[in-house]
Amino acid sequence: MSELSHVTEAGDVRMVDVGGKPLSRRRAVARATVRMAAETARRLRELPKGDALATAQVAGIMAAKRTSELIPLCHPLALSHVQVSLEVGAEGVEITGVVETTAQTGVEMEALTAVSVAALTVYDMAKAIDKGMSVTDITLVEKTKEPA
């Protein structure tokens, strides 16, 4: 079990000590897709609950900032940049999240959390008119680290 950084030799979980690591510029990009009927995709800005795209964008940004409260072993980070964009296509919405910081640990969980919560927000807001939606392809597409 020792190759898992969050698990001790005894099998206990822990938050990794990053105190001795130097500060680095960190960036992560994640994506998620919400598949839906074409008619649903056309109506996303005019749903009974309101504009799903604007709401999901804000929800994703808020989620990135609260990742350490949602995922127990994540470090709380001061994020310098969060961007969530939603692109509507005929078969649904592709969500991209970009997160940046200067810290001792990466921001991939923040980017993944941003797109996941944005996708769930789209789903929540459109579920009344489309019972066949699915959230798919939540993935990390880029992770970079440069000296600060």
What kind of feature is each model-predicted range?
Residues 1-75, 79-148:
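C-terminal binding/interaction regions
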